[in-house]
Design a protein with these regions (language model features):
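ER/Golgi luminal nucleotide-sugar-dependent glycosyltransferases, focusing on the catalytic module
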Residues: 1-648
């Protein structure tokens, strides 16, 4: 069979990951010719990767999405040349695999001689139009999904298909692509009498889900011999999964790929770490570590102690907390080298005396400049001493003295220490996590949610620090996904474990204490707060990913507290909004909040957005104090907030 393949590719930097060449290597065995169409850039590496399979590579302006990429290839060949092929396959880089030879699929479908066009999988449609804008049918028809669709010769030669593509309007958005092409193509040509079908029959799943390849991919791979799966599975909004599942689809998919196929899992990891936000893939894959309190693997624990260099970095300032700091260090393996910074010779002497009796390999205490606090001490003074180590932990004697009541700050310290260094066995289990997972770069405690820290969930943990973190990433040359709508998997509180190689790009910057503001240090929005949030992105840039670690005790408390938060919010919301599902509740409440904000009556807390805070700071610096306070008093009287503590 003479078969042409059209492969559409887009990646913002034009780099071609190995999962694509793995897919093309099998696909090409079933093709006579292959043409690749790239929207936007194609790097030197990317071109070399595609040239393994074809010399027909078109790089075009990034417009029209996949639809116009396919149209470009069709126009390049022309209908006369296209009519010489028995089949034209159109597919793209949104698919991963195969987990079984594609030849099985092509051979099976070759026997279906009655078909004019066919595909891999089907979307079962929806009663209404889930997209904004006008839809051809005002509902979502059953349709072949556009990630893999095949035209047969008779269909290619038809005037209806040729006219369809010749008159295809420019596609302006993803929604436009779905509504003008993917969701309507199948019905349009079925209504004209053309025959179609898909390789993966999911008629039995119509009542189960409208999108089987995303919602139950394991069933399709295991039970229906589907050879491919969606890359999007790993970066799909976890909240969207919760509308139809308990969050298990991607975890089941990964387990099946790991245990029942020979698909190279490193192809998934490398692409995830390079191109996806860890907030998405760590939740979809369930990468949060529940660390046991007793050693689970004696052999692995012994291997870490014998074969890896382990360091503990500590910045100690509060001498009344020295006993707690010693207890923290005492949980480290005896082979650990400890590097401590403090700000006075007197404190140095106290620390050396307190640590003298601890069973540790070596303890080095250094007096450093008292500027930039723990973050500056870590980057300027401690990090240069651990560059040759394998794994390290950083902690400081955290005392959130600005937080009232004091119990709130003390509990923040509990969250950090409980989940990073609960006991000696716990620490060994943490270290074996790094040994077992070559892509793990950072383990940090969960972000605190109690007391005033509840607003972490309101601002996705950014507060006024998104713009300064993004600017710091650019300064350091780190190009990884970052979004103000997604929480960084970061060590809030600056207590965490890390693979030293994972933070090398940050250590290489050559930090000086002058890079940090002098005392009194602002409560938020500084370079230190940006660094606190940039750790996970640095790790990603180095080829690793961040994750959270929790003790079993804390995980139970966390689960209970989240249920308490959810119940406390949902009960009053349900009196006003549609709370049938999480999605409906979020959508209706979000729409209401957006309307209030649009008309000037909204308030999203002290960290609503950094632009507003910067504007207030700009005014505060330039106006007389009394004038500024009067202006803000009028603003609060008219627009609010009226009943919450709010920093103007």
């Amino acid at each position: 069979m003479k078969r042409l393949g059209i492969f559409f590719f887009y990646e913002k930097n034009g780099d071609v990951d190995d999962f694509i060449t793995y897919y093309l290597r099998d696909l090409a065995r079933n093709l006579t010719e292959l043409i690749v169409v790239c929207n936007g850039k194609l790097s030197k590496q990317g071109r070399a990767a595609f040239e393994e399979f074809t010399d027909q590579i078109i790089v075009r302006e990034n417009k029209g999405l996949d639809v116009w990429a396919y149209k470009t290839a069709l126009d390049h060949y022309g209908w006369q040349r296209l009519s010489e092929f028995d089949e034209v396959v159109m597919t793209n880089s949104t698919l991963m695999g195969p987990v079984r030879p594609l030849k099985e699929m092509f051979d099976a479908m070759a026997e279906r001689t009655n078909l004019d066009f066919w595909g891999l999988t089907i979307h079962h449609g929806a009663e209404g139009n889930p997209f904004k804008g006008k839809h051809l049918y005002n509902y979502l028809p059953v349709h072949i999904q556009s990630h893999f669709i095949v035209y047969r010769k008779k269909f290619i030669q038809s005037k209806e298909l040729q006219n369809y593509w010749d008159t295809m309007p420019m596609i302006e958005s993803y929604t436009d692509s779905v509504q003008r092409y993917e969701s309507v193509f199948t019905k349009q040509f079925a209504d004209k009498g053309y025959q179609w079908d898909v390789y993966v029959n999911t008629d039995d799943l119509k009542e189960f889900t409208d999108y089987p390849l995303l919602v139950c991919p394991t069933r399709l791979l295991r039970d229906k011999k589907c050879p491919l799966f969606k890359r999007r599975s790993f970066m799909h909004d976890f909240e969207a999964y919760l509308n139809d599942t308990a969050g298990e689809p991607v975890r089941e998919l990964y387990a099946y790929l790991r245990d029942h196929t020979d698909y190279p899992l490193e192809l998934i990891w490398k692409n995830m770490i390079r191109t996806m936000h860890p907030y998405d893939f760590t939740r979809n894959l369930g990468l949060t570590r529940l660390i046991p309190e007793r050693v689970q693997d004696e052999a692995s624990a012994a291997a870490v102690r014998n074969n890896r260099r382990i360091a503990l970095c500590m910045h100690l300032y509060f001498m009344d907390m020295l006993p707690q700091s010693c207890a923290f260090a005492a949980n480290m393996p005896p082979e650990t080298d400890v590097f401590i910074s403090t700000n006075t010779p007197e404190k140095k002497q106290q620390i050396e005396e307190a640590f003298r009796t601890l069973p540790l390999h070596a303890v080095t205490v250094k007096v450093v400049e008292n500027r930039g606090r723990d973050v500056a001490a870590f980057l300027c003074d401690l990090a240069p001493q651990i560059r040759e180590y394998d794994y390290a932990c950083f902690m400081h004697d955290k005392k959130a003295i600005q937080t009232k009541p004091g119990s709130v700050g003390a509990s923040f310290g509990y969250v950090c220490n409980e989940n990073i260094c609960k006991n000696a066995d716990y620490v060994l289990n943490v270290l074996t996590e790094f040994e077992k997972d070559p892509y793990l770069g950072l383990l940090c405690p969960p972000f605190p949610t109690h007391g005033v820290y509840f607003m972490n969930m309101c601002s996705n943990g950014w507060g006024p620090n998104f713009d300064n973190t993004k600017a710091l990433m650019k300064k350091l040359g780190i190009d990884r996904p970052i979004s103000g709508e997604k929480m960084p998997i970061a060590p809030f509180g600056s207590v965490f474990w890390f693979r030293v190689k994972a933070l090398a790009p940050l250590f290489d910057h050559g930090w000086q204490h002058e890079d940090f503001p002098p005392e009194p240090l602002p409560q938020d929005g500084t370079i230190s707060h940006a660094i606190e949030r940039i750790y996970p992105f640095v790790a990603q840039g180095a080829g690793y990913y961040p994750a959270q670690a929790m003790s079993a005790d804390y995980a139970v408390a966390r689960c209970d507290s989240m249920q308490a938060y959810a119940g406390g919010l949902i009960r009053p919301l349900a009196r006003v909004f549609d709370c049938t599902t999480f999605g409906s509740a979020a959508a209706s409440a979000g729409a209401f909040a957006a309307r209030r904000h649009w008309f000037g009556f909204g308030n999203y807390g002290p960290y609503e957005n950094s632009k507003r805070r910067r504007a207030r700071n700009w005014l505060r610096k330039r106006m007389p104090k009394s004038a500024y306070e009067n202006m803000m008093r009028v603003k609060r009287t008219v627009l609010g907030p009226h009943d919450v503590n709010y920093e103007d």
